[in-house]
Amino acid sequence: MNGGRDGVRYRVLAVGLLLFCPVTLWGADNFRTAEYERNGAALDSINAAEAYSLGFSGKGVGVAVIDATGELNGDEFAGRVDSGAGWISSPWNGAFHGYAVAGVIGAAKNDSGIHGIAYQATLLPLGTTFSSDTLVNAQLNVLDRPDIKIVNNSWGYRIFNDTVQTFSADRQVELLDGIINNNMVIGTEMAKQGQLTVFAAGNEGHLTPSIIAGLPTLLDAYGIDNTLANNWLNVVAYDPSQRPSSAAFIASFSNLGFGSSAYTLLAPGVNIVSTRDANTTDTFSGTSFATPYVSGVAALTSEAFPYLNGKQLADILLSTATPLTGSNTPRAVLLIHKNYDDHQNYLSSDLNVYATGNAVTFSDEEMTVLLARVREDAFFDNLTDEQVRSAIRARASAQNINVLTTEDYQSLFGQGMVNAYKAVQGPGALNAQRLSNSDLNSGTFNGNYAIYGVDTQGYSSTWSNDIAQVKNTTSSSPLYQLDVGLRKQGAGALYLTGNNTYLGPTIVEGGSVVVGKVAQGSGSLAGDVWVQSAATLGGHGNIAGTVTLENGSTLSPGASVGTLTVGNVVFQPGSLYHYEIDEQGNADGLNVTRDATVAGTVVLDAPSQSLGDRFTLLNVGGTLSGSFDGLTSNSTQPFLQDTLSYGNKQAYLDVVRNNRAFNDVATSLNQRAVAQTIESQNSGPVFSAIANSRSEAAARSAFDNLDGEIYAASRAALLQRSRYVRDGINSALHDENAQSLWLSTWANKGQFDETAESSRVNHSGYGFLIGNGSPVGESSTLGVVVGAEKSKIKTDARAASNDVTAYHVGSYWGTGYRGIAWRSGLVYSYLDMGSERDIQVPGLTSRAQADYHAHLFQGFAEGSHRFAFNDSLSVEPYGNLSYAWLDLAGGQEHGSAAALRWERQDSGAGYSTLGLRGEARWSSLSPVRLYADAGYQRRLTPDRNQTRLSFVQGGDAYTVHSATDDRDALLVRAGVTLAIKQNATLLLGYQGLMSDKMSENSANMQFGLTF
């Protein structure tokens, strides 16, 4: 037999002379590396780079290689040789043939040498001497490995289907009982367990494949039951450097597909660079090296669709091949035909030209290629180049050319060139010629159909090719001329995104079928769809026929949210319509171009809805009959419910208010108050926002955010903070600065702790007072004071704050009477306030702001008596009474639909304090004095932490409460007074106020100057 382009010839004799066939998510361009380009023409001709760009490399797929090596060493195969690999025979010197075949399938993509078509596949090499015994044992070995789906066979015999019947009867019996029977029995068992057998057509320049590559045809010819044909592929070689229309495109050494067209594929087999051993590469030609391209594409396809068996892999490869038709048809084929006797002994070679016309004239380019091919055959060694050219021209002349009918000529090329890119996208047709009688659907689903079944076994995958139908044309078959349908079985989702023209029904028996994966994308079915119990139909596409949803089945438009268009729809009782609304309010839809009959249950999947929403469940172009039996929902929204309604040609889902009161979910006083107020509005944006709450917790959070607690908190904090002005005046009177010009400043920070009813209140600020007094009589002082203060009050949990600017003016009086020192003051403050509330409720998100003012009046009186132990130490018990009255002007917020308003309100707070001051100095002459103060403060008036509010949009007024101070608190002070000069003093001090529910800390400084 003619060997590779390197001129190597092989001949092996065994129990019959055996012949092998050696004529020796990036874009696609990202895969065209230097490693790829060493076989760039071959790989590009089968669209390999495009298949790689879809993410496929053969990873995880096992391919058996029955050939001349049982070991694959070197970096090209490291880590991807199956543990079952080994020699069936003793190792021999033909091993490089097996290395080369394995390299075409799965040499690594490692930036070195070459890479195979399925460069991450796992390989199972089984080494033979190509004797019948070793081949049978290798096949039996594969039969014990049902996990290996693809079996590559780059070997064969020099016997052909169209000549075997010319052999003697004894020779025919010998073949039938020997190699034919062995391969039939083993091949049948492989087919039963889902393995795909891929065979080289052979290199004898024959119109038909060798006897084993064409075994299904031979079995049919002898009338032998043939159950292996659908798991069998015959591979013909072509020259990838030539255009398909060229007379030099088909390899001149290759056997073709005549009589075996239904299971024949073409693959590149001329000048293929592959591994020769563990370290080197070489160039090879032959159907031996075309066959692994088909096996490799099968591995890519198996990776894409792990649930497919060998027959189904063959279905895809055959239906997605690029046919040699039209402008792609080779205008002629030159074959170097080798002649053998019935024992495979070589006799001679001759040239044959095949075409559909009466004569062919070859171009110079074609003649150059054809001349080189003929010169490789030793039979023509004695001819000159010109004699070879003349022989080629003579065979192409009108007198000698072999003229075939168009149908017979097309059959030479089988189904066309294997196409990796199309194959990894699913079938291109459902072929009833490749179905069995058991695939007949009789009467069910409204007719008789040939049904193609696939079990996705829990995998989800996409068939994106346009799937046509091929009818059975065998008149004796029960499938004769029936439309072809698809039966989807098993768990997992099957996405159909092509424009599918098969006319039989699509039967969804298990898992889901999604017609159209994305909105505005492709995806259509020409026939009916039947969805059976526990199965689902979805998608964004178009179904021209009738969709019937049986009891227990589900319709779920979209792939998530989307709209499905159908011709007719029938919801049978017990069926489910899964209707989804997403976070943005986009909803499923069903467009029915003709008639709809509805029943069953609508199952709503809606994480959020809005009051008053109306969603269209289906639009009907024809007649709408029936009604849905019920509605279930996963919604947790506490104040809404869904109802069904109908128009003449529509079914609707309406979102309405249920009868649950808003305050049913409230857990605090403030929540209940604001909930009742919002309920009283009956409509409007605030009412709708609460009605649209996703959960009870969300509603409570909304009540908290809307309640305006900052206004109650501000009143409580302002009354509490008023003491800093009183304390500044009192300190000046106590330290005898009141008869001079004095300055008092302070900075402070405090909080009211949160309670079960209200949030934590933080307040802080700083201010100053300037006073001036003069003596009145012998022991009295009268003075005036002015000042200003900045404060910030926050309720962080309510996302609210209030900025306060205060302007103070007042007077003070101090005197001594019968050993008691009396101090008192009166102050008026004008408060300029600006509030902000961040409204964080969905549907109301905004910032509510208000500018408003208030008036604060306060006064105090204190009496104390000083006990001096000596010139250095004294104590002073004291009692203090104070009162502050806050007059809040009316106002309202702006900037939000949830804005609040209020009328004029006032409140007051009175305090009493009993305490003891202590003072110490080193001596009577010391300029430094230390002081400390501890007191018990009691609030004499009730809590003053309420404010009456209402929404600008309307509704009843309500009272909101805030956290406030405790009735009883501990007051502490400490500091130092420095006599700077005879006429100047400086006081630095700390003051704290503490109780269970509040705390305050402040630092103060006072400076006095006497003139």
Regions found by a protein language model. Name each.
Residues Y307, S319-A468, T474, A587, ...:
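Outer-membrane translocation/initiation segment of Type V secreted surface proteins
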Residues N682-F867, D871, L987-F1011:
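Outer membrane beta-barrel translocator domains of Type V secretion systems
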Residues Y52, S57-K59, F96, A108, ...:
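Substrate-binding/access-modulating region of protease and related hydrolase catalytic domains
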Residues G62, D67-G70, L219-E303:
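Extracellular S/T/G-rich loop segment that most often corresponds to the catalytic His/Ser-adjacent loop
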Residues S882, H894, A898-F1011:
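Outer membrane beta-barrel transmembrane domains
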Residues D277-T280, T287, Y293, L300, ...:
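Extracellular repeat-rich scaffold modules on cell surfaces
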Residues G485-L486, L496, L503-G585, N591-T601, ...:
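Extracellular beta-solenoid/beta-roll
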Residues N30-F31, Y36-N39, A49-L135, P146-K149, ...:
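Subtilisin-like serine protease catalytic core
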